[in-house]
Amino acid sequence: MAAVATGNVDKLKSDVASLSQISENEKNGFINLVSRYVSGEEAQHVEWSKIQTPTDEVVVPYDGLAPTPEDPEEIKKLLDKLVVLKLNGGLGTTMGCTGPKSVIEVRNGLTFLDLIVIQIENLNNKYGSCVPLLLMNSFNTHDDTQKIVEKYSKSNVQIHTFNQSQYPRLVVEDFSPLPSKGQTGKDGWYPPGHGDVFPSLKNSGKLDLLLSQGKEYVFIANSDNLGAVVDLKILHHLIQKKNEYCMEVTPKTLADVKGGTLISYEGRVQLLEIAQVPDQHVNEFKSIEKFKIFNTNNLWVNLNAIKRLVEADALKMEIIPNPKEVDGVKVLQLETAAGAAIRFFNHAIGINVPRSRFLPVKATSDLLLVQSDLYTLQDGFVTRNSARKNPENPTIELGPEFKKVGSYLSRFKSIPSILELESLKVSGDVWFGAGVVLKGKVTITAKSGVKLEIPDNAVIANKDINGPEDL
C-alpha cells in the first residue's frame, strides 16, 4: 500500500474536495495523513540496539515529586491554569449499550460523566477555582453528548464540547474515499484516533479561547479511566519544571504486556508500541523485566506548546493503519495516538504513578471490580478498599452471557463480595443470588443447556463449581 503512486493521492484529493460533509481543515488533515502514509511513514520498526532505559530524570518516580503547597490560595493559582479534557468519542457498543460509553452507570446510579463532573465540582468548591471540563466527541457521540451535558447546566463546572476530525474510510482496492462510493451513512467515516486531539483543539477555536483565559495545561485522559483524577502534585511539578508534556506510566503487570512503554531513543523520550517492535524482539517487549512500565494514556500537555507545534504542522506521529471491512468492502483507517506525540515536545517526561491512577472499565468484568466491595465511592472518587491485603486486583473472566451491561446486571441480585478473591472464571448460564461471598480461586461453569443458580448468601472459597451438587 505504501508504494501507491502519487497520482492516486491527486485523484483522492479531488474526490475528497467534493465531500460536503466535512470542513476544509478536515480535508487537509486527511490528505496530509494519507500522503505521509503513502510515502512510507507508517509506524517504523525501531533499531533495537539504540533503545535505552529512561533514567529517573526522564521517568520521574511519583514519590519523588515535591509536596503540593499547603496554602489554599497557591492551590487555587495552580488550578486556575488547568483544563481537564476527557476523550469522549467512543460508543458503549462492546458492552451492549447505545450512545456514548461515558453514560454507562458505574456505581450508585452515577455514570462516568457524572463522576467526572462531581470530582471537578468538588475541586472548584473547595478552592474557589474554575477548572473547566472539555469533552472531545466524535461524530458518533456528538449529538447524544450535547443533550446529556444539559443536565449539568447548574454546575460550577464550565463544560465545553468539540468534535474530533471526521475522515473518510479509504477503499483499499482503488484508493478512493468510501463516501464517494455511495456509502453516505456513518459507516463511510471514522474518527482518526486520539492523536487528533491536538489539531482538533486548535481547529475548534477552544485552544485560543483557553489560552485567552490564562489556562496553561490540559490534563487529557480516557473517559472510562476512573483513576484519572486531577493530581495537584503532578500539576505543580510540571509548572515548576516547565515540562511541556508528561505521560503517566505505571508498573506493568502480566495483564498489560501489550501496552506501549517509554524509552530513551536518540536523545529523546519516546513511546514504543508493540507495532514498532521487530518480530524477534516481541517477547522481550512483553516481558516485565526489561520494560517495566506502560502508558496509562493520562497525559498532561502545555497549551502554548500545542499551539506552537500544531501551527508548525510538526506533530507527525507514527501512523497506525487499521484495516476494516464495511459491507464486504475492504477499507483502511489511518490513525494516530496522542501518546506518540511525546517526542515532539520540549522537556517531555514520564511520571511513574501508582496503579490506582489506572482503573479503566473496558468490559463488564472491570465493572464488577468497581461495583464491588473492593472499591468505595466518595465525592465522585472511586477508591480502593484498604481492607484488601493483596495489592493486585483479582483477575475476572466472565463468559459471553455477561458481556452486555443489561444481561450482566440481571445475573447478579447484588454484586458479590470479592475482597478476598484471587481469580474468578464464570462460563455458561450462571445467576448469582444476593449476598454471595467469593474467596481465593473460584471457577463456576454451567453445563450446556443448564441454568446454574448460586443461592443467596453462599460463601464460595477456592472451589470449582460445575453444578448445584458442588455448592
UniProtKB/Swiss-Prot annotation:
It catalyses: alpha-D-glucose 1-phosphate + UTP + H(+) = UDP-alpha-D-glucose + diphosphate. It is found in: Cytoplasm. GO terms for cellular component: cytoplasm. It is an enzyme of class 2 (transferase). The keyword Cytoplasm applies. Its EC number is 2.7.7.9. GO terms for molecular function: UTP:glucose-1-phosphate uridylyltransferase activity. The keyword Cell wall biogenesis/degradation does not apply. It holds the Pfam family UDPGP. It comes from the Eukaryota. SUPFAM superfamilies: Nucleotide-diphospho-sugar transferases (SSF53448). CDD domains: UGPase_euk. GO terms for biological process: UDP-alpha-D-glucose metabolic process. UTP binds at L87, N88, G89, G90, K101, Q164, G193, D224, K362. Keywords: Cytoplasm, Nucleotidyltransferase, Transferase. Its main location: cytoplasm. Belongs to the UDPGP type 1 family. Plays a central role as a glucosyl donor in cellular metabolic pathways. This is UTP--glucose-1-phosphate uridylyltransferase. It comes from Pyrus pyrifolia.
